[in-house]
Amino acid sequence: MKKILPEKYIKEPTGYPFSPVLSIEGKEIVVTSGTCCDDYDGQIPEDMETQARNTILACEQFLKEAGCGLENVFNVEVYMKDLDQWNDFNKIYREMMPETLPCRKALQVGLLPGYMVELVMWAVK
């Protein structure tokens, strides 16, 4: 993947972790379904950082099963129950995602009880 920074952007547009445009070459696209997390004991974690980490790990496992990984992700859809937790989510997202950050959108939505975040990842292989 090649990150493209349009001339109008002198710096990252908002300082948030995403790429404004990516150029992608590949033969096959892999998409995860909307993915939330459960803890390893089947419980839903009560804090955003743990939910974010576990959800990204679950997506990563799905991608591996399809023959790719987080480094192949070019777009992430983030669905959050409360955008006031955006910074907590981004802290984990920055730690776990590759240097060439995917394009991204984020929406505040209603989620199933207990869940704070749901992700859909688009990857190329």
Question: Where in this protein do the model-derived segments appear?
Answer:
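N-terminal presequence-like segments and the immediate start of the first folded domain
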Residues: 1-74, 80-125
